[in-house]
Amino acid sequence: MSLDINQIALHQLIKRDEQNLELVLRDSLLEPTTTVVEMVAELHRVYSAKNKAYGLFNEESELAQALRLQRQGEEDFLAFSRAATGRLRDELAKYPFADGGIVLFCHYRYLAVEYLLVTVLNNLSSMRVNENLDINPTHYLDINHADIVARIDLTEWETNPQSTRYLTFLKGRVGRKVADFFMDFLGASEGLNAKAQNRGLLQAVDDFTAEAQLDKAERQNVRQQVYSYCNEQLQAGEEIELESLSKELSGVSEVSFSEFTAEKGYELEESFPADRSTLRQLTKYAGSGGGLTINFDAMLLGERIFWDPATDTLTIKGTPPNLREQLQRRTSGEK
């Protein structure tokens, strides 16, 4: 992994009681040892693999103002990180759920792009076996379950300040209040809505195939083409490029897909991140609720699976063998 650490600072917040968070600040930056580089590389890998929301700094963001001064050389990185950790403590103190943790600020470069990663990591206890096969207590940073994380694309922020996507953060699973406090600390608001872009893409694909008057099999082939392209981009860590996708769909219609989306006003960005859960809808139908979970390939609708919208009834012809065996065992046992 081509990852180079420029500067990295580590501080700590310790929860002493319900009202107080103690601040423990380092007096020096961490040295980028092999262990430190491996830790940051793991953080980068874990964070990059998660679904993220996109945002931008508010005009009054204290963090953005301090970061700008630091980037201009008016404040060193350690002082910037110490002051920011103090603001984080003050923001956390407003919430009853506030916990401590290890606060990390890392300025690093990956594939010619500069980033600032800010995260609060849990320092957990565990056990280890030493060389004498004795069991001893140990501590570790819970990187895999980190949920308070934000990353600023410094290159994008400085070269394209009007962007709505230079800041990314995790949202959803950690809860609304946790997301709120971290966004307040960052002085940021949500920008590009990647899920909405992906939903818009799916709608555009359906409308595009309908206007081209394709039959069912042809429509499904186009959806599979779109899914294959988007999934390849997702696996490669690349964004969906509307023009590239349009080339993949050349021949479907006399009008190119990119021209179609522009003319119909879908408001799709030229490029945007792929959202795995939304893209699955190109090839599958899935849903759950009320104790029922259903998942099937889209091509089966109208062939083995039929939906009657009037009665909201789904009819399945031919059940999977393992399900059929379970049903047979259960029904035979009840006779």
Curated annotation (Swiss-Prot):
Keyword entries, A-Z: Cytoplasm
Claim: ATP-binding is one of the keywords in the record: no
Main location class: cytoplasm
Cellular component, GO, one term: cytoplasm
MF (Gene Ontology): double-stranded DNA binding; single-stranded RNA binding
Keyword DNA damage on entry: no
InterPro entries, A to Z: Nucleoid_associated_NdpA
Cellular compartments annotated: Cytoplasm, Nucleoid
Family classification: Belongs to the YejK family.
HAMAP family xref list: NdpA
Official protein name in the record: Nucleoid-associated protein YejK
